[in-house]
């Protein structure tokens, strides 16, 4: 009986503590560039609707608590290991979390990660309108569809050793074709704990945006 009472007391204490610290926003003070407004953004995150561990509303709330102004949910199109348990389309995470984001005054960017072998690797399509249209086996057709939706295309973790064993980021002919068409807009320099210094030269030489994201899957 004493053990049970102690367990209940500890559980209640932990619950009380978690409630006391949740819902708090940790502001990041980053000055504006003259003539612009600086926003803190994460353009690469995952939820349970691909290979992430959090429900979409939790991911959005987490971003707000971390002090971000905008977040993109970019679940994989081709890799959905929880699909046997979650019967939904590729817009589900956006649909579920939009109301929560609006309530937090957080900009929620509609996105998806087009997930292919290297090359071309993994690319985020940001600011899309319908992820369900990005299911063509032809990679270039998927990118074209995203671009027609107004997408910003980002080349993700180009030096990720699971796809690039030597860890050296490269622009392959298919990437150069995207650049020539104006269909590639940025490359990740930072991805979670990794950074790829050569990306700075790639972006400078091809007039692409230098990106940094969490690629968060857990918490």
Regions found by a protein language model. Give the residues of each.
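Positively charged n-region of N-terminal signal peptides that target proteins for export
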Residues: 1-5
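Distinct, well-ordered alpha-helical segments
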Residues: 120-123, 163-179, 199-201
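Extracellular glycoside hydrolase catalytic/binding regions
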Residues: 158-160
